[in-house]
Structures are given as structure tokens and as C-alpha cells.
């Protein structure tokens, strides 16, 4: 049993509140336990200069944490004048993950911006961001289809993400902050609804892990992501 009374293979309490804000084409407040992230999707006509004239769309992401999302206040990155390497890494991960959902050749020359703002952090902010932003992206697609009448549905399928870790030889699913800080190994996994891998980010924090332990963590991640995608479908009414 874990510090929050979960089993090792159990997700935290997960929720998705769609249409959370008024103006964005898609918006979701996603909660992974005490981690809460506001994910908004904004649609703009046009694409980056290097894509102009190719008939393709683009999807990109930005990520940030509110100053008091954690135990102590962190200065806004805008006030510091630059983004941290961590922020840049995470928003690239989110963008890559969400582009796997969409056939960009069917999106027209439109750009969808996914903004993921962490309101409260207790571990797994990047995996919560991917999983919540996927729903916001679906709602934004519906908005495009209503107003721009795309010739074909660009949706390929859902994606979701979860963290797993290894501590004292045991695999843990969906780490909170305390678990993430104390585990021997942590791994972030992003997958499609077909069970394909998009991203694997793994680090041995305290000691190296074996191939068998890697397999244990990936099996656990597959289980968790299948459950998350089922929850996404329920939230979308599918």
C-alpha cells in the first residue's frame, strides 16, 4: 500500500472537466490526484512559414506552472526573461505527442496551439498535460469542422500518458511528487489508443534498472494508459 492508500498498479483519482473556459475552442481541467492542469486549445488560420503553401496544418504546445503551483512560490519565467530547459523539454513532448493524434495533411493550413498551465503540482504534470490536452484538441477539431468544413476528418486517435517508477524492486504506476522524488527509476510513457508508443523518457535516478524491470514498468504503463484512454472516451461521450 502506498502513502495515498493506492495499490502499486492503481492510478490516482482522474477527472476531466471539459469546456472549462469560455473563449478557447477547447478547454479541459484535468486532475491526476492533486495535480491539476488547465489545458486550452486555440485555433488560428495559417501555419508556420516553413509550412506555407503545403496544404498541411500544425499543432504545437506551450507549458508553464503558476507561481504557487508548488510548496514554495516560483518566479514566473516571463519575469526571468527566459524559459527553463525543463519547460522547453516538456512543451516539446506535449507537442510531439498531440501531433501523433492528427493527420496534419487533412487539417488544412490551420494551427492549433495547446496551452498547458499547471495550477497545482503533485507529480506527473507532463503526463497529465498530454492526457488532458488530447481532449481539448478533440474539442478544437470539432470547432474547426463546424466553421471551416474540412474535407476529411483529420483525427487518427487518442493519446494518453502516465508515469511509472521502480522502487526497491517494485514497479509503481502514476507517481505523485513524493514517490517521484524517492524512486530509484522513473519513466514517462506516451501511447496511442492502438497501443503504440510515442515517447519513452526514462532515468535511473538512484541505481540502474534491468531489462526485466523495464518490462515490468512498461507493462504497468500500458495498463494505466488503456484505463486513461477509456476515461477520455467517457469524458468525450464516445
Curated annotation (Swiss-Prot):
Signal peptide: none annotated. Pfam families: RNase_PH (PF01138), RNase_PH_C (PF03725). CDD domains: RNase_PH_bact. Its EC number is 2.7.7.56. It comes from the Bacteria. Phosphorolytic 3'-5' exoribonuclease that plays an important role in tRNA 3'-end maturation. Removes nucleotide residues following the 3'-CCA terminus of tRNAs; can also add nucleotides to the ends of RNA molecules by using nucleoside diphosphates as substrates, but this may not be physiologically important. Probably plays a role in initiation of 16S rRNA degradation (leading to ribosome degradation) during starvation. This is Ribonuclease PH. The lineage of its organism: Bacteria, Pseudomonadati, Pseudomonadota, Gammaproteobacteria, Moraxellales.
Amino acid at each position: 500500500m502506498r502513502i495515498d492508500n493506492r495499490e502499486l498498479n492503481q492510478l490516482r483519482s482522474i477527472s476531466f472537466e471539459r469546456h472549462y473556459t469560455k473563449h478557447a475552442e477547447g478547454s479541459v481541467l484535468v486532475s491526476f490526484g492533486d495535480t491539476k492542469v488547465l489545458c486550452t486549445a486555440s485555433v488560428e488560420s495559417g501555419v508556420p512559414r516553413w509550412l506555407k503553401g503545403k496544404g498541411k496544418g500544425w499543432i504545437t504546445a506551450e507549458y508553464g506552472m503558476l507561481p504557487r503551483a508548488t510548496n514554495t512560490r516560483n518566479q514566473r519565467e516571463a519575469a526571468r526573461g527566459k524559459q527553463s530547459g525543463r519547460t522547453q523539454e516538456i512543451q516539446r513532448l506535449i507537442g510531439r505527442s498531440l501531433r501523433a493524434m492528427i493527420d496534419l495533411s487533412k487539417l488544412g493550413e490551420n494551427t492549433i496551439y495547446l496551452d498547458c498551465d499547471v495550477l497545482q503540482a503533485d507529480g506527473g504534470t507532463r503526463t497529465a498535460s498530454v492526457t488532458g490536452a488530447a481532449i481539448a484538441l478533440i474539442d478544437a477539431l470539432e470547432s474547426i469542422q463546424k466553421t471551416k468544413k474540412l474535407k476529411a476528418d483529420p483525427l487518427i486517435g487518442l493519446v494518453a500518458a502516465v508515469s511509472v517508477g521502480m522502487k526497491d524492486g517494485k514497479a509503481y504506476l502514476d507517481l505523485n511528487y513524493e514517490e517521484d522524488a524517492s524512486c530509484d527509476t522513473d519513466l514517462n510513457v506516451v501511447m496511442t489508443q492502438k497501443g503504440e508508443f510515442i515517447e519513452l523518457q526514462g532515468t535511473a535516478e538512484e541505481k540502474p534498472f534491468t531489462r526485466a524491470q523495464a518490462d515490468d514498468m512498461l507493462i504497468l504503463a500500458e495498463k494505466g494508459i488503456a484505463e486513461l484512454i477509456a476515461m477520455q472516451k467517457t469524458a468525450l461521450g464516445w
